[in-house]
Structures are given as structure tokens and as C-alpha cells.
Design a protein with these regions (language model features):
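Bacterial N-terminal signal peptides that target proteins for export
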Residues: 2-12
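Bacterial N-terminal signal peptides
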Residues: 11-21
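Compositionally biased non-globular segments, especially hydrophobic aliphatic-rich helices
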Residues: 17, 24, 28-30
Length: 224
């Protein structure tokens, strides 16, 4: 077996040649990139890497999520990326994120250890919302950008500093819409009960109930 001790009598050139022939130290294996659908099946506490397009701007849901995270979606599914730092990301930026799967009061979230775990890859394709029935907002839609259309079935209710909520029903069952204060959407913008409204937003969950979180005033269309 070769050892450095036995090399003291070798010419320096021969020693360098011999050392250069030794195999390099093995590099740490790179974290495999999963589809978001695959990542969503991993147990809480699992470290994963995903790539996707930002679906909601950084900090849009800060009043109820208590962080500065953003939505992320690929062709397979979507999820929420939870961060304390506002990275000022907006759709349709494309990013790679490494983090740990966590349950945030029912909502599946990917939590990076630090902001450097979010790598900007350039612009991506804008996400087209998935049209769904109001009764179908649930686990199958969670993390995606969705759109519902129906009648405003109940008057808006204030949720204090968190924002406010209202309900839309297309006849299949009411969907809860939660509006965070950062979005710039106000209660006064909504029509009266019974009027038609279309809502686009991030399909979310809080505790046992599912909801849609609009991202900006453009996500609410009256009379459609």
C-alpha cells in the first residue's frame, strides 16, 4: 500500500506524479430534483428539491401566513414556499428551491433553510388558472392557481388585521375566498349578494377548511 511516509526518498517530481494519479475524493451527491407532485407525497420532515414557476408574489399572503413566502407551481402540482425573507419574486419567475416539507396548519409548505436555497433560473411561462367547481376546492387543488365563477352567496366578513372573507357558489357548494390585506383588494370593491363574480387565486388551506386566496384586484372580476 502506498503511504506518504514511504515517499520521503522519492524525487519530488515522481511524488507529484504519483499523488496526481490517486483517485479524487468523492463529491457529495446532488439533491435530485423532484416534480412538485412527487414532493407533495414525501413525509413531513423530508428534504426535497423542486423547480417551478412562481405563482403568487412574495409576501402576498403575509397577513394570514405570517411570512414572506410565495406560491410555486409546475405542470404536475403546486405548493407554498415559506420564507421569513421577502425575495421580491413575482410570476412568472422560474426558480429551483431546496427545503424541508412541513405542515403549516393544514397547508403543505416547502421551507428552505435560508434564502440562498432559492435559486433564480430566469423567466418561466405564465401559469394558466385551472377552472374548477366551487365545491371542488380541496386537497386535490391545494397549491395550484385556480379559478371559480358563481354568485356571491354571503356578505363579506372582516377578519381584522388578517383581511376579510366571502363566499362564491356556482350551485355545487360554496367556496371560501380569503383576501389578505397585502393584495390591495377592499371589501367595497365587491358587489351585493347574488351578483356574479369570478375569482382566481392560490388554492390554500387553513386548519380544516379550504379556501382560495386572490393575489391582486385583477383576480376578482365582477359580473363574470
Amino acid at each position: 500500500m502506498f503511504s506518504i511516509y514511504h515517499c520521503r526518498h522519492l524525487p519530488i517530481v515522481a511524488l507529484l506524479l504519483l499523488l496526481s494519479a490517486l483517485p479524487p475524493a468523492a463529491a457529495a451527491p446532488a439533491e435530485p430534483t423532484l416534480s412538485i407532485a412527487e414532493a407533495r407525497t414525501r413525509p413531513v420532515g423530508t428534504k426535497v428539491t423542486v423547480e417551478g414557476v412562481v405563482s403568487s408574489p412574495s409576501g402576498d399572503f403575509a397577513s394570514s401566513f405570517s411570512d414572506e413566502g410565495f406560491g410555486l407551481q409546475d405542470r404536475s402540482a403546486g405548493l407554498y414556499v415559506s420564507l421569513k425573507d421577502n425575495l421580491k419574486l413575482a410570476p412568472p419567475a422560474r426558480v429551483r428551491v431546496t427545503g424541508v416539507i412541513e405542515d403549516h396548519t393544514g397547508l403543505l409548505a416547502l421551507v428552505p433553510t435560508n434564502p440562498a436555497d432559492v435559486i433564480r433560473l430566469g423567466p418561466g411561462r405564465p401559469i394558466m388558472p385551472r377552472a374548477v367547481k366551487t365545491a371542488d376546492i380541496g386537497e386535490a387543488t391545494e397549491g395550484r392557481i385556480v379559478r371559480v365563477a358563481g354568485k356571491l352567496s354571503q356578505a363579506p366578513e372582516s377578519d381584522g388585521a388578517y383581511g376579510f372573507k366571502f363566499w362564491v357558489n356556482d350551485g355545487s357548494g360554496a367556496a371560501l375566498i380569503f383576501v389578505n390585506t397585502q393584495t390591495g383588494i377592499t371589501m367595497g370593491r365587491l358587489p351585493s349578494v347574488g351578483a356574479r363574480v369570478s375569482v382566481t387565486g392560490f388554492s390554500s388551506q387553513y386548519d380544516t377548511h379550504y379556501e382560495i386566496d386572490p393575489r391582486s384586484p385583477a383576480d376578482i372580476a365582477i359580473g363574470k
